[in-house]
C-alpha cells in the first residue's frame, strides 16, 4: 500500500470470499414437505439458503379430507388451496413439475422442468395405492389417491345413479358400491357414503332398498389398532346407515362387472357392482425404489433424525418415511399428524446442519387418533380419552382446522376450515 498526501493507493486487492448459499430442494407439497418449507421460511433469511419446492400441482390438498370429496359430501375445491398462499416467494422458489428421477449420488433431481442440483434434499413425495398384485384392480377399481381421483369417484357414482333412473331396463348392479378395505380410509369413506346415499336417492328418484354398499376386508378385523369397543361402535353405526360388511373375505380379482371374492378354502363368490373403490393399502412413491436407498414398498426406514441411511444430505418425511414404534415394535402409521411433526423436525435439523450443530432425534408426539363416521359422528382417542359421536366428530374437525392453521395461519383456517361443528 502506497501513501501520498492526497490518496491511499491499494496496489493489490484480495477478493473477498463469498459464502455460497446452500440449496435445499424439497420434493412434494404434502403435509411433510410443506411443513418443512413453512418452518424453513420462518427461521431462515433470504440470504441464508436457496429453498426450492417442486410439486406436480400448484396446490396442496388435504389428503385426510379426500374421502369426503370422493363421497360427494365436500366439494373438491374445499379440499385444496394454492401453494402460493402459504409460501414466501422471496424465500422459496416454487417449481410446478413432475419429479422423474432422483440421483442421490450425483445430488441431482430430474423433473419435467429440467435438472436440479442440491446441497440438501427433502423427499416428501407421498403415497401411492397398493393393489398387492390382485388382477384387475389397477384397471377396474377406483382409488382415493388425490383430488382428481376423488372427483372421479364422486362423478362416477352420480353417473351410475343417473343412468339407472333413465334406463328402461334397470340394472340394479349399477347401484352396488363395493369398498375394498376396512382400515382408516375405507371406514371414513363408508361413513360419508352413509350420509350421501339418501341424498342421491332423493335427487335421482332411486328407491333406497335398491342401493347396496358392501365393505370387503381380507383381514379378520375392522380398523386394526383401534380399541375394540370403539370398533364395535363404528360398525354398529355404519350398519345402521345400511352399510354391509364381509370381513375375512379377500378380493381375488376385479373385472368390468364387479369383483370376485374368496369366501372359503375353495369357495368363491362373484358380486356384480357398478362401482368398486379400493382403499386397502398404500405404499411410498415408486421413485424411491430407483434411488438405491434401501426401502420396503418404497418406504425408507430412516435414521432417528429423519435422514436416509448412508446419505447425510437426504431427509425423508411423510408417507415415504418408515419409523418403528419401539414400544410395540411396529411402524408408526403414515398419518398427517406425524408427517407435519416430521416436517417441523426436518426443518430444525437442516438448520442445525447448516450451522454445524448436531441434529435431533424425531420423537412423535401422538395426541390421539380419530376416525369420522360421517358429518356428525366419529370414534377416537384424544389425550388418552376414548370418545364417540358428536364429541368425537367435533374433535376431528378441530384437528382438521389445526392442520390448516399450522401451515397457513388464521386466514387459511377461516377460508377453508370446518365450522359445522354441531
Task: Give residue spans per PLM region.
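C-terminal auxiliary extensions adjacent to catalytic cores
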Residues: 12, 375-422
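A Rossmann-like FAD-binding core segment of flavoenzymes
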Residues: 90, 94-101, 195-304, 310
Amino acid at each position: 500500500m502506497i501513501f501520498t498526501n492526497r490518496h491511499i493507493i491499494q496496489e493489490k486487492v484480495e477478493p473477498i470470499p463469498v459464502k455460497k448459499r446452500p440449496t435445499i430442494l424439497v420434493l412434494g407439497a404434502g403435509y411433510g414437505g410443506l411443513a418443512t418449507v413453512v418452518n424453513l421460511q420462518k427461521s431462515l433469511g433470504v440470504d441464508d439458503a436457496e429453498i426450492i419446492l417442486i410439486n406436480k400441482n400448484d396446490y396442496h390438498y388435504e389428503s385426510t379430507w379426500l374421502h369426503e370429496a370422493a363421497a360427494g359430501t365436500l366439494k373438491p375445491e374445499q379440499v385444496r388451496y394454492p401453494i402460493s398462499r402459504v409460501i414466501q416467494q422471496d424465500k422459496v422458489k416454487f417449481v410446478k413439475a413432475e419429479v422423474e428421477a432422483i440421483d442421490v449420488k450425483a445430488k441431482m433431481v430430474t423433473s419435467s422442468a429440467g435438472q436440479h442440483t442440491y446441497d440438501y434434499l427433502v423427499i416428501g413425495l407421498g403415497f401411492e395405492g397398493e393393489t398387492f398384485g390382485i388382477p384387475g384392480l389397477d384397471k377396474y377399481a377406483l382409488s382415493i389417491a388425490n383430488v382428481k381421483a376423488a372427483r372421479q369417484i364422486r362423478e362416477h357414482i352420480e353417473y351410475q345413479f343417473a343412468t339407472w333412473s333413465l334406463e328402461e331396463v334397470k340394472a340394479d348392479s349399477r347401484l352396488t358400491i363395493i369398498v375394498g378395505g376396512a382400515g382408516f380410509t375405507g371406514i371414513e369413506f363408508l361413513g360419508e357414503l352413509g350420509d350421501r346415499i339418501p341424498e342421491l336417492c332423493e335427487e335421482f328418484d332411486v328407491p333406497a332398498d335398491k342401493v347396496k354398499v358392501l365393505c370387503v376386508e381380507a383381514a379378520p378385523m375392522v380398523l386394526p389398532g383401534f380399541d375394540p369397543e370403539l370398533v364395535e361402535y363404528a360398525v354398529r353405526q355404519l350398519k345402521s346407515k345400511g352399510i354391509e360388511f364381509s370381513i375375512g373375505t379377500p378380493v381375488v380379482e376385479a373385472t368390468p362387472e364387479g369383483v370376485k371374492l374368496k369366501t372359503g378354502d375353495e369357495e368363491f363368490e362373484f358380486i356384480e357392482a357398478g362401482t368398486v373403490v379400493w382403499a386397502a393399502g398404500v405404499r411410498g412413491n415408486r421413485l424411491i425404489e430407483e434411488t438405491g436407498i434401501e426401502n420396503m414398498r418404497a418406504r425408507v426406514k430412516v435414521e432417528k433424525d429423519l435422514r436416509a441411511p448412508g446419505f447425510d444430505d437426504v431427509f425423508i418425511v411423510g408417507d415415504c418415511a418408515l419409523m418403528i414404534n419401539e414400544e410395540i415394535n411396529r411402524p408408526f402409521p403414515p398419518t398427517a399428524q406425524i408427517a407435519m411433526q416430521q416436517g417441523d423436525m426436518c426443518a430444525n435439523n437442516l438448520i442445525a446442519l447448516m450451522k454445524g450443530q448436531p441434529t435431533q432425534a424425531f420423537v412423535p408426539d401422538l395426541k390421539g387418533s380419530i376416525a369420522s363416521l360421517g358429518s356428525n359422528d366419529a370414534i377416537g382417542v384424544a389425550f388418552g380419552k376414548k370418545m364417540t359421536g358428536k364429541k368425537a366428530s367435533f374433535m376431528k374437525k378441530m384437528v382438521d382446522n389445526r392442520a390448516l392453521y399450522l401451515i397457513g395461519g388464521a386466514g387459511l383456517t377461516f377460508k377453508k376450515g370446518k365450522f359445522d361443528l354441531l
